[in-house]
UniProtKB/Swiss-Prot annotation:
Cytoplasmic side: 1-6
Transmembrane segments: 7-23
UniProt membrane topology term: Single-pass type II membrane protein
Region (Disordered): 68-87
Organism per entry: Neisseria gonorrhoeae (strain ATCC 700825 / FA 1090)
Protein name stated in the entry: Cell division protein FtsL
Main location: membrane
Annotated function: Essential cell division protein. May link together the upstream cell division proteins, which are predominantly cytoplasmic, with the downstream cell division proteins, which are predominantly periplasmic.
Topology Periplasmic: residue spans: 24-87
Length: 87
C-alpha cells in the first residue's frame, strides 16, 4: 500500500500543478485579450477620425473656399512650364 499511496500522491500533485498552470495561462490570455480589445477600440476611433478628415479634405466646396480665401486661381497655359529630368 505504501507504493500505491506514493503514486496517488504524485498523481494528485501533478494534477494540482497542472490546474495551477492552466489557471495562470487563462489569466494571461484574458489580460492579453482585454489589452487587444482596448487597442482595437483605439484603432477604430483613429480610423473613424481619419475617414472624417479625409472626407473634409476631399470636399470640393471647402477646397474652393480655401482657394478663394487665399486668392488662388487655376493655372493658365501661359503660367505653366515643363521641367524635364535629364539623366
Amino acid at each position: 500500500m505504501n507504493k500505491s499511496n506514493f503514486f496517488l500522491l504524485l498523481a494528485v500533485c501533478v494534477s494540482a500543478f497542472s490546474v495551477v498552470m492552466q489557471q495562470n495561462q487563462y489569466r494571461l490570455n484574458f489580460t492579453a485579450l482585454d489589452k487587444a480589445k482596448k487597442q482595437e477600440i483605439a484603432l477604430e476611433q483613429d480610423y473613424a477620425q481619419m475617414r472624417l478628415q479625409q472626407a473634409r479634405l476631399a470636399n470640393h466646396e471647402a477646397i474652393r473656399a480655401a482657394a478663394e480665401k487665399q486668392n488662388l486661381h487655376p493655372p493658365v497655359s501661359g503660367n505653366t512650364f515643363m521641367v524635364e529630368h535629364q539623366r
